[in-house]
């Protein structure tokens, strides 16, 4: 995030400098009369027509990314969070995801295709309020667990560079893996270097690119250094990061993997075994044999039932006895009964993990902690998807012209629904690939245009342009209103 602040300043300043303004008319479509900017424009204009191919490549990759990282991932977070409430509505988790996915996709469609600006304004008002509530809730939890903070920070650092379990490798390998995840999730959080945010900042009403760049560099600090750090520490101080909860295990689901304990206690990924024998709920495997894992953590016991609510370990019913066949994704009991789902203690991940942390951390004050996360996820995810639809349609216009906007938005809505029902690991994997493909041309352009960036900055500071902005604001405040005149 610290490095991203400099990157964000650079790309936004360049985008403001090289942006295009399309003049619309009263009879024209809504998307005309707007500003278009972003890396594709400063690549083409700043580096010259010989680099047009890279601008096209960037726009194409960012348009694909808008379907995934900024859309499918967001929908997946919402459905993954709300699927925990499937029992309340008498639905299985997947059906709940389908229902929620359809609702989210419908909301996004109404906003980006129907152009209902009131919903956009509502989100613009509510989202900052929810952000404040989320941060306040996190700060309250940390204050209530202040004595645990030093140990929490120590745990974060220790597990990052010398983990007890969960990933493969040691030494330099584990450092690289830690750095990769940090960069991936940091970029996902603040978009620094990705080239998406400059598209939005290009539309800002200012004649000073540097002033907009300064505003933009605050974003990585706020949403990553502050919000993400609060989230991470809340997860650690409440202890949920290392806890298991009763879980409905889809034996062929996207959260399933197989792990085997290697040297130094590190858990590594392995191909699934042919079968796993389970006696009285406990898997009987030899040392070095891959074991069933959920969210990358080994599941120690399996049950065929779980009482209504399925909230605590005491709710588990009837330990499973039989054989699990990973290739088929089914478990066959000794009496011949086939199960596609079993129950067992498993770790949480993603938004449900954060939800669990807030629920536990704020439990002394009431049972509404998890609700903060649910509402925050719902509002943030939908507003983020709507924002990314704008990024993508600017790319579509750059590549194909205005006629491509409506087809693009149709595909965007479809991808929103598909992302909501796809396995979490799959959505993230594809999103990370697309994310990497847009970063490369953008960073090349930023480095190549660093001289021009310095020229823009020197001009701004030599003119002391910020003083003019202050004077203009002061004159605006002192000017008589129409009523006074």
Model-derived features with residue positions:
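Flexible loop linkers connecting adjacent transmembrane helices
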Residues: 6-49, 199, 241, 245-251, ...
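Membrane-interface loop-to-helix entry segments
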Residues: 58, 75-82, 96-104, 108-157, ...
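A generic transmembrane alpha-helix motif of multi-pass inner-membrane proteins
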Residues: 164, 173, 177-180, 405-406, ...
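Hydrophobic, membrane-embedded alpha-helices of multi-pass small-molecule transporters
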Residues: 54-76, 96-105, 143-151, 158-209, ...
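Transmembrane helix-loop junctions in multi-pass membrane proteins
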Residues: 68-79, 108-120, 140-152, 233-245, ...
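Low-complexity, proline/glycine-enriched hydrophobic segments characteristic of transmembrane helices
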Residues: 89, 239-363
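Helix-loop-helix module between adjacent transmembrane segments
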Residues: 2-35, 39-40, 44-76, 80-111, ...
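Selective recognition of specific alpha-helical transmembrane segments in multi-pass small-molecule
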Residues: 3-7, 101-116, 127-147, 210-239, ...
């Amino acid at each position: 995030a610290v490095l991203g602040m400099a990157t964000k300043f650079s790309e936004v300043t360049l985008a403001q400098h090289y942006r295009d303004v399309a003049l619309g008319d009263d009879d024209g479509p809504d998307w005309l009369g707007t500003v278009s900017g972003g890396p594709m424009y400063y690549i083409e204009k700043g580096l010259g027509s010989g680099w047009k191919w890279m601008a096209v490549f960037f726009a194409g990759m960012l348009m694909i990314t808008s379907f995934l990282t900024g859309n499918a991932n967001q929908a997946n977070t919402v459905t993954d969070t709300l699927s925990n409430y499937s029992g309340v509505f008498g639905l299985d988790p997947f059906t709940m995801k389908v229902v929620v996915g359809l609702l989210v996709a419908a909301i996004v469609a109404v906003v980006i295709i129907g152009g209902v600006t009131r919903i956009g304004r509502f989100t613009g008002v509510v989202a900052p309020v929810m952000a404040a509530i989320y941060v306040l809730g996190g700060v309250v939890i940390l204050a209530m667990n202040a004595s645990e903070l030093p140990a929490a920070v120590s745990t974060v650092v220790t597990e990052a560079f010398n983990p007890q379990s969960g990933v493969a490798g040691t030494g330099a390998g584990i450092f690289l893996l830690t750095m990769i995840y940090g960069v991936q999730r940091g970029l996902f959080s603040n978009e620094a270097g990705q080239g998406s945010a400059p598209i939005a900042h290009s539309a800002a009403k200012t004649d000073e690119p540097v002033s907009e760049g300064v505003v933009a560099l605050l974003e990585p600090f706020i949403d990553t250094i502050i919000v993400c750090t609060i989230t991470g520490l809340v997860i650690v101080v409440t202890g949920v990061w290392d806890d298991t909860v009763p879980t409905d295990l889809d034996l062929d689901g996207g959260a399933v993997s197989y792990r085997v304990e290697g040297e130094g206690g590190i858990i590594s990924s392995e191909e699934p075994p042919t079968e796993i024998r389970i006696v009285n709920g406990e898997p009987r495997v030899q040392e070095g044999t891959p074991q069933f894992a959920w969210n990358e953590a080994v599941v120690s016991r399996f049950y065929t039932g779980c009482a209504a609510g399925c909230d605590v370990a005491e709710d588990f019913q009837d330990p499973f006895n039989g054989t699990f066949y990973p290739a088929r994704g089914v478990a066959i009991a000794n009496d011949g009964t086939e199960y596609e789902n079993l129950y067992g203690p498993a770790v949480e991940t993603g938004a449900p993990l954060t939800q669990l942390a807030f629920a536990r951390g704020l439990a002394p004050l009431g049972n509404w902690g998890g609700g903060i996360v649910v509402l925050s996820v719902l509002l943030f995810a939908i507003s983020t998807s709507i924002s990314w639809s704008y990024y993508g349609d600017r790319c579509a216009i750059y590549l194909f012209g205005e006629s491509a906007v409506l087809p693009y938005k149709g595909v965007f809505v479809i991808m929103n629904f598909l992302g909501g029902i796809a396995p979490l690991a799959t959505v993230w994997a594809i999103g990370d690939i697309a994310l990497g493909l847009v970063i490369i041309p953008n960073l090349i352009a930023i480095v190549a245009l660093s001289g021009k960036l310095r020229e823009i900055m020197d001009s701004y500071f030599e003119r002391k342009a910020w003083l003019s902005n202050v004077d203009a604001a002061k004159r605006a405040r002192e000017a008589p209103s129409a009523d006074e005149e």
